């Protein structure tokens, strides 16, 4: 039963998104709300996993030799000066690989590319609509962001990202993902309930005794990373991106959250860090 004071937020009429979904119906075009308007509901999609990696493998550059270029997928090519055919997309970034190679870098760190909703911020400043530009508010951890794809058709975002990673590796460039496991896009008690909250709010988030959300992340909620179920979810996610997308490494946003127990206290030996 629904009981906010006990941290129970599931409602029988609320459609929930599978946290393990490999693809999500989302923003086909950046800044445009799909059919459903403000009441749009995220749905999982079935995807094919038939990308041919040929002989692509992990480059294993020595850590001390890495020259890392941190970038935002959309921001890197969105301006016309980038000269690409598909600006602001995975494909647009692939077009710029010769430029990256000329710089002499041997790794790129992609700022968040997991599914997020740039339309969640409804504020207006000086007459301009604000967007969740950076992507640090994850909707689905196993799914590439749909608005970063250049072709509007189902399942293309995964193959387009894999093609980018394949071409980067062919040019000696490793791929590191910026991952955000400290909080999610569901926010605090005033935020939406579309996934973890409805599945088991008490397990996935750190809650106060009266059912409110601890906010050590500064983003409304905190993932309960050292609970066995959440810990398994995180490790499953990282393993998925390594196996299926051949990702070389990860940068953990606000990694100190990974060291906290369910009440927010720092742990001497956090299980999630030991697992990683």
Spell out what each predicted region is:
Residues 251:
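Conserved, function-defining core regions and hallmark residues within catalytic/recognition domains
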Residues 1-70, 77-85:
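The feature marks proteins involved in alpha-glucan
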Residues 72-92, 98-246, 254-272, 276:
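Substrate-binding/active-site clefts of carbohydrate-active enzymes
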């Amino acid at each position: 039963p629904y009981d906010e004071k006990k941290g129970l937020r599931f409602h029988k009429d609320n459609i929930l998104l599978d946290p393990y979904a490999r693809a999500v119906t989302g923003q086909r075009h950046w800044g445009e709300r799909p059919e459903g308007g403000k009441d749009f509901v995220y749905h999982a999609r079935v995807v094919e996993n038939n990308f041919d990696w040929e002989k692509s493998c992990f480059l294993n550059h020595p850590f001390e030799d890495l020259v890392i270029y941190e970038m935002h997928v959309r921001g890197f090519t969105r301006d016309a000066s980038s000269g690409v055919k598909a600006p602001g997309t995975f494909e647009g970034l692939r077009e710029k690989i010769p430029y990256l190679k000329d710089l002499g870098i041997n790794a790129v760190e992609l700022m968040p590319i997991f599914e997020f909703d740039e339309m969640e911020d409804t504020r207006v400043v000086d007459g301009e609509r604000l967007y969740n530009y950076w992507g640090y508010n994850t909707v689905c951890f196993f799914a590439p962001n749909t608005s970063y794809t250049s072709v509007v058709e189902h399942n293309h975002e995964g193959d387009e990202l894999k093609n980018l990673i394949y071409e980067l590796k062919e040019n000696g460039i490793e791929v590191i993902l910026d991952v955000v496991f400290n909080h999610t896009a569901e926010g605090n008690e005033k935020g939406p309930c579309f996934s973890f909250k409805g599945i088991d709010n008490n397990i996935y988030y750190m809650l106060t005794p009266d059912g409110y959300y601890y906010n050590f992340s500064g983003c409304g909620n905190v993932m309960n990373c050292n609970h066995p179920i959440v810990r398994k979810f995180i490790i499953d996610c990282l393993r998925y991106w390594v196996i299926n997308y051949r990702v070389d490494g990860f940068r953990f946003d606000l990694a100190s959250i990974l060291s906290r127990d369910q009440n927010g206290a720092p742990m001497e030996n956090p299980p999630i860090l030991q697992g990683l």
